[in-house]
Amino acid sequence: MCDRTLYAVEVGLMNVNDIKIVEGSIDDLENVYQRFTADFANDELKGYEHLKQLMSKKRYKLLLAKDPIIHEVVGYAFIYEFDRLQGIWLDYMAIDNQFRGTGYGALLFKKLTKWRQNGFSGIFIEVEIPEEKEGFTRENQLRRIRFYERLGAKRLPIPYQLPTNDSGLPMYLYFWPSPDVELLPKELIQEAISEVFAYIHSDIKHKDDVLMGFYTLNV
């Protein structure tokens, strides 16, 4: 099982060119989608038509990471901009195969932290919980956690689940706070999760059951 930002993990920060973040169009989505389906596990994928519908509502965006020196799209991210909370939800982030492990993932994330200049609160990130069994998978999972923590993200002390077609998948929920923002109060975190479930996961029939389970555990 991979988390929704698996392929952004860097094994070491190398000298890479700066990148430019460009908002993608529906035409870009068509080009990215084949790569997207290869990057993430089937139970974590969104269908093409659903992503297209989300993007048409303007708050859900496809962002392309372009290296202007080599004229390549080196990665991409899908983000959701909150209605009231001045922050974003990082739904997916991936770096192209040939550029993984070179530093582009960290560079892309740092660009996202500057997505808004004024009043930006931070970024929510879903991260896979490490499995108990020692081995390659667990080490990769721990490395992803170190990646985000090194960039300043903090794990929220809540039992979060990602709604999938089959059930709710337990995940860690991290939050990267802007330098002038403390960790968000519980009420704002719950509001953010509720908004994401209603907007991003509108295609999941039992999303409300997963959400109610979250509220029950947090009363």
Regions found by a protein language model. Give the residues of each.
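Conserved active-site alpha-helix within GNAT-family acetyltransferase domains
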Residues: 129-157
